[in-house]
Amino acid sequence: SLLCTLVCLEVVFRVFDWRGYHAPRTRDWGHALLPETDLLPGVFRQFVPNTEFELAYDSNPRGYFDSNNGLRYRINKFGLRGPDFALEKEAGTLRIVLLGDSFVFGEGVKWQDTLGEQLEVALSAKLDRSVEVLNVAVGGWSTVDEIAYLSQRGLHFKPDLVLVVYVLNDAE
């Protein structure tokens, strides 16, 4: 039965042209990370505010990335991915802090395709009001990092709601 299972898996992988996970070829984000001495206590990794970096991938089978198989990431004035936002939210705006790791950050995903941006667009339309979803996430963060960041910085954004996206590898 093991041989039969392996043969079936091989057929499935060939039929669906599954090539497996491709990690970024280059991680040109070293300059975008704060030195350890500047990190908030209990937070593993943070970005330098107002910076950009690019990750390039081995292939671009769906034509999603740029001509160099890369994707640029913009880090705002708060050291978070996405456009700048005011510390004080506008009256009538529902502000959501979306807390997570690389999944929420959107590694390998254009800004408009991130979970937070999709949620913001969908909720704004559904609720017929201004909704602001803040992408409070960094690749490599665990639940410990998320709680530390939220308590030291994230609550200063005065969210109406905090959503924690929990992926199994976040357990700590």
Where are these regions (language model features)?
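Membrane/wall-proximal cationic-aromatic binding patches
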Residues: 21-122, 126
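A secondary-structure boundary/capping signal
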Residues: 99-100, 137, 167
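Interaction-surface signature
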Residues: 13, 18-53, 143-172
